[in-house]
Design a protein with these regions (language model features):
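Active-site catalytic motif of lipid deacylating hydrolases and related acyltransferases
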Residues: 1-68, 114-195
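A short acidic (Asp/Glu
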Residues: 14-17, 81-87, 110-113
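Residue in the alpha/beta-hydrolase core beta-strand immediately N-terminal to the catalytic nucleophile
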Residues: 71, 98-100
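Gly/Ala-rich beta-loop-alpha elbow adjacent to hydrolase catalytic centers
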Residues: 72-82
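Conserved hydrolase catalytic core segment
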Residues: 84-97
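Active-site nucleophile loop of the alpha/beta-hydrolase fold
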Residues: 100-109, 120-123
Length: 195
């Protein structure tokens, strides 16, 4: 499964820190990672992100590039481009395993694919849910600043909320939450590929 990472408007080192934080809790080699270059294109530009995704997949899969399953992890302004790219990919006939929106406050998140929100504090968590709660979600407790959630997911503690058991949230790190979701959707993609 491909994982498209759509960073926000920040120093690219923060995205490298994010990926290193994920590496500490998951087998990164189980996925093919595509990091959208926000140093060359606007983080919020779905046109540029979609072009990047298509170009990357066509370079590897000449004939069946549209048959590749993609999960999208987006942060801040990248959530704007990420959700629009997910819809673009779906309209072209592609499969979106999930959209994981990290601190996409104020961005409506609705799709015919799983959507998950991570928030740096409780206020952002509940106020963002008004624009599409999605499925399982996470918020940092204690609260952290906006960029720290992206830069240090492995040390950001918080609560995992599941719609299937809303009365029993689980204490977890942001990195563990993301790793669990990616593992879940990767397993589904493998099963679908085999059938």
């Amino acid at each position: 499964m491909y994982v498209l990472v759509c960073p926000g408007i920040h120093d690219p080192q923060a995205t490298q820190d994010f990926l290193q934080g994920l590496q500490r809790v998951m087998d990164e080699a189980a996925f093919t990672w595509l990091i959208f270059p926000t140093d060359r294109y606007p983080a919020y530009s779905a046109i540029h992100i979609s072009w990047f995704l298509c170009t990357q997949l066509r370079s590897v899969h000449l004939q069946d590039w549209l048959n590749q399953t993609v999960a999208i992890i987006s942060f801040s302004a990248g959530v704007v481009g990420g959700i629009a790219t997910a819809w673009s990919w779906r309209l072209m006939g592609g499969t979106i395993a999930a959209l994981i929106a990290v601190d996409g406050w104020g961005v409506p998140l609705v799709g015919d694919f799983p959507v998950h929100r991570l928030s740096h504090d409780y206020f952002t968590h509940w106020s963002s849910a008004l624009l599409g709660a999605g499925q399982d979600s996470f918020y940092a407790e204690p609260a952290v600043d906006h960029l720290s959630l992206w830069r240090s997911p492995e040390t950001t503690q918080g609560w995992w909320f599941s719609p299937s058991s809303p009365s029993s949230p689980q204490l977890i790190t942001a990195a563990e939450f993301i790793a669990t979701l990616l593992s879940r959707y990767n397993a589904r993609a493998v099963i679908e590929d085999e059938s």
